[in-house]
Design a protein with these regions (language model features):
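A short, acidic, amphipathic alpha-helical segment used as a generic capping/interface helix at domain edges
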Residues: 157-170
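Glycine-rich phosphate-binding loops at beta-strand->alpha-helix junctions
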Residues: 168-200
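Short beta-strand scaffold segments in enzyme catalytic cores
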Residues: 1-3, 50, 95, 113-118, ...
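Short glycine-rich, Thr/Ser-proximal phosphate-binding strand/loop in the N-terminal lobe
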Residues: 1-26, 59, 122-150
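Short glycine-rich anion-binding loops that position phosphate/pyrophosphate groups of nucleotides
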Residues: 49-52, 110-114, 183-184
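Glycine-rich phosphate-binding loop plus the immediately following alpha-helix
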Residues: 72-74, 78-90, 123-160
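Two-metal-ion RNase H-like nuclease active-site motif
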Residues: 104-109
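Glycine-rich phosphate-binding loop and adjoining helix at the ATP-binding site
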Residues: 12-45, 51-103, 143, 192-208, ...
């Protein structure tokens, strides 16, 4: 999606399926196709589903091992001859969702579990909640990611999510929790007053703020 300087969309959202074997080469080829559908951009923000440090993708458990230590930011900047910033996808979704007041936690429910923590609008970098041990030595992702949903079914998945929300409030003392990702559509219980579901477009709209918060 193309955004203006205020973070408002000025184009339709474009989507291309992730390659069946999502190696860096295969994904970059699809990103080239996307770039041609969105002409006229002067800079690029990229949300990546894994650990990112200084534009390098460190680990992507749910994508492909070849993304380990891949210089995605530098590669795209050279490929498209534009300034590029790459960040964790949950972090960028958070930029688009938060109100920049107090302690705000963002959790995305999809193939895996993404998470981002903000204090007064500033990102606390490096949070990887999805892989943190939770119950019986298994991680949040084992229970609340796609494999957990497939294993336990929708009813138990909702019970586990409700329990996780209560536990996370004890851990982070958040003022607000934002839930995003495709599996939020499967939530069937009433959320607490300080928890809300946000649109998947927040992951796109937050791309502008990625440039503001990091200079």
């Amino acid at each position: 999606m193309l955004l203006d300087a205020a973070g408002k969309s000025i184009s339709e959202r474009q989507r291309i399926p992730t390659p069946e074997t999502p190696t860096p080469a295969a994904v970059l080829e699809e990103l080239d196709k996307l770039s041609k559908l969105l002409p006229g951009f002067d800079r690029v923000s990229v949300g990546f589903p894994g650990i990112v440090k200084r534009g390098v993708t460190i680990l992507a458990v749910n994508l492909h091992p070849a993304w380990a230590n891949f210089p995605l930011q530098e590669t795209l900047a050279k490929r498209w001859d534009k300034p590029v910033r790459v960040g964790n996808d949950a972090d960028i979704a958070g930029y688009g969702a938060i109100q920049a007041t107090g302690v705000e936690l963002v959790m995305t429910l999809g193939t895996g579990i993404g998470a981002a923590l903000f204090t007064n609008g500033h990102l606390v970098a490096g949070l990887e909640l999805g892989h943190h041990p939770w119950l019986l030595g298994k991680s949040y992702e084992d229970y609340l990611g796609r494999r957990g949903l497939d294993k336990f079914g929708k009813k138990q998945w909702n019970m586990l999510l409700k329990e996780a929300i209560a536990q996370l409030e004890f851990v982070f003392n958040f003022d607000h929790l934002y839930l995003g990702g495709g599996n939020t559509k499967k939530i069937n219980f009433d959320l607490p007053a300080n928890v809300s579901v946000v649109s998947n477009e927040s992951g796109l709209l937050g791309g502008v703020v990625l440039w503001r918060d990091q200079g």
